[in-house]
Amino acid sequence: QFAEDVVPWDERRFGLGQGLRPQLINFVKGNRVRVSGVTLLHSPFWVIHPLLCKNVTVDGVKIWNEGPNGDGCDPEACENVLIQNTHFHTGDDCIAIKSGRNNDGRMWNKPSRNIIIRNCVMEDGHGGIVIGSEISGGCKNVYAEDCTMDSPHLDRVLRIKTNNCRGGRIENINMRRVKVGQCKEAVVKINLDYEPEEPCYRGFEPEVRDVNVEDVTCRKSAYGVLIVGRDSVENVSDIRLKDCVFNGIGRENVRITGKTRNVKFDNVMMNGSLVLASEDRPYKSMAQWMTYSEMKRTPKSYLLDFASKPRWNYAVGIELEGLLDTYRVHGDDSILNYLHTYRQKMIDERGDVVGYDYNAFNLDNVRPAKFILRMQQYGARKGEKIALKIFMKQLLNQPRTREGVFWHKAIYANQVWLDGIFMGLPFYCDYAVKNCSPRKARRILDDAVNQMMQTDRRTYDEKTGLWKHAWDETHRQFWANPLTGQSRHTWARALGWYVMAMTECLDVMPDDYPRKAEVVALLQKVMKAVVQYQDKKSGVWYDVLDVESPKNYLESTASCMFAYVLLKGSRMGWLDTDFNEAGKRAYEGILKRFIRVNKDRTISLTDCCSVSGLGPGKGPFVPAGKENYKRDGSFDYYMSEPIRDNDAKGIGPFIWASLEMERLNAQ
């Protein structure tokens, strides 16, 4: 307050009992000042404080000061400063560069400048190298290099803190070749709103520009880069990070609020992901970015999903449908040609499908037919029409439970899986609406609705409010509860298949179809439960929904499915607007937790469960010796299945969720 009121320094009297603490070493207006080869302990306040000095050297000093406000070395309004070979263990900032607080700094008008910091070790403290907050006179030309920092109590590595009480320009700040074990908050933090409740005269907007951080590594932190700019002025600019690797980031790689300009990342990896400023991304659309990433990773569409040879596969069909929807929104014939390649490779002019076995009565094999059905609008082929009829014939002859629900496969006799509802019913409904008479289409839609409702009745678990992965009509499968026939747990992706099946069937049901409301009501029931199991911290979902265990993990494919259904369902009016907020939270969680930017500027979807299933156990169509008792539906079984990147079963739903977010953001 004395400074704000322009009280001369020699008239500033604080009086008895104010508890003012002196610095241990305080040089004022000195020249050629040197502190070297000493150990400094337990200062009441800052340890070394050169004020308005020139040509200062601190060399080979050991500082141990754990008290409050126990800064190690604070050059204030100084020029030509060298701090090297010094070990800091402090209760506050290790090095804090200053240039006067508020009006004092503005009256002095002496920026701290030409400061070199090298070969130092920083432990504990609020910051390793800090500029501010008493920085009203400005600061420029700081070079920090070849330092090491490592402590769970060290809050930040490079910190710039100021506010509009201080003002001042901070520029040309450089850090390189710094190795950090861990820090508590952020590797780099720039804060122009430090202590926003401080009583002072305001209106002195600070400016931070030309900050360069190169070859800095950190193994653990909460944030990589944390920038708090001003909302009223664009006073943070030209911030560049190059060749840095920050791992073990617990909260967010980069968080920027307020107005900034030209924040750049050049070969910066955080948590294994290449960091790009928004303007440097190759595509603004995440759907396009993922589509082109997959096309680059797998130039031949019939080898998607890690195939070594062409295969008729439900996961590939789902991904190709996602790519098709990217094409429908954004265009580009290269995508369309990529899609054509699959259909041309897999179905010949006679209607023969590579690898398809009608007699397996495998619902998974029906799913890619929906992609082929949708592609008819981009050129129909005779062989495809024949093949589509064969797939419809399979469904019409598919073995069923006594209640009329499709068996999942012949080898899974008498079993209803949530997965199978998605594999069979959307094509069943779509083909009927497009190719059958209205009366026959109505019968097929009724059949599909009945199957969804029976599946709900047989797999729903009142105890958890969730749906089990599968149900065995005989109650005799080794994985089935002998009383209910249900499997043990709710596998998130299985429930994702179930709700996506409802969504896709609703898409093709005519508005005047009287049982459409039943499907909407079921979708609402399931998604209400899904949202209750959404992880509050991350916004995404665990692989097994009904188990709380450290072994459980947040899983991406199911999270993409749920995000997509929440966003689309609310847009279509099938779900209330509250579900839209849950969908946005889920999508943001997916981007933060599961999307990795690779060095080649492609993106990947991480933490995908490769596969999970049940059995088969003994059955009428299971060859002897082909039983799989490992797949017993236990939690440990689900946790034993491999986790991988870029599983097609997640890529398609991620693209769909991304396109829904684009629609939402365009409103």
Feature-to-residue mapping (PLM):
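Long, well-ordered core segments of solenoidal/helical folds
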Residues: 285-303, 337-355, 386-405, 445-471, ...
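Extracellular/periplasmic carbohydrate-active domains that bind, remodel
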Residues: 1-278
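Oxyanion-binding "anion nests"
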Residues: 499-546
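Asp-box/WD-like beta-propeller blade repeats and closely related beta-sheet repeat scaffolds
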Residues: 3-15, 22, 385-423
